Amino acid sequence: MDVNNVELIISAVRPEQYPETDLPEYALAGRSNVGKSSFINTMIRRKSMARISQKPGKTQTLNFYKIEEALFFVDVPGYGFAKVSKTEREKWGVMIETYITSREQLRGVIQIVDLRHKPTEDDRMMYEFLKYYEIPVIVVATKADKIPRSKWQKNAKIVRETLDFDPDDKFVLFSSETKMGKDEAWQFIKEGME
């Protein structure tokens, strides 16, 4: 998709704050500091629309980005960040679960994992949660450029096995540096919009 117009519409914490719209929405879920902001910026060809932080746990709201008057990317808080209080983590969990299970406009979730590392228990639980609720999901393994190409398949296999990955789902190796995987991710989005 050729993206020229992107706007952060609202940062929401409750359903009554979600934008009133019929446009399809795609949620971006992943651990803190896994590369969600870089993924968004690569997909929409912007350097800093989604703020990239060195500090994990920066996104604390559901951020609704309207793209080309055609769809929304919804950046959800990163899960599994240890330095946030248990109460805060539970609040985020409820916020994310409420959005994913009740939002009619949600067409799919882009679950982002780091190709360099074995997925965590939180990653596994998120994937299981999406499968349980029959939410279409694509797993995007970011930071492929950070490891030698010779390790891509081995690491991808570890990610798939750890998540108990459903072969019917889409799995994409992604790099915000080289833009690898960008077209495949857009393809998943376009298919869900048809």
Swiss-Prot record:
GO BP term (any one): division septum assembly
Function of the molecule: Necessary for normal cell division and for the maintenance of normal septation.
Alphabetical keyword list: Cell cycle, Cell division, GTP-binding, Magnesium, Metal-binding, Nucleotide-binding, Septation
A GO molecular-function descriptor: metal ion binding
Origin organism lineage: Bacteria, Bacillati, Bacillota, Bacilli, Bacillales
Protein name, per record: Probable GTP-binding protein EngB
InterPro entries named among the record's database cross-references: G_ENGB_dom (IPR030393), GTP-bd (IPR006073), GTP-bd_ribosome_bio_YsxC (IPR019987), P-loop_NTPase (IPR027417)
Pfam families (UniProt xref): MMR_HSR1 (PF01926)
Coiled coil feature spans: none
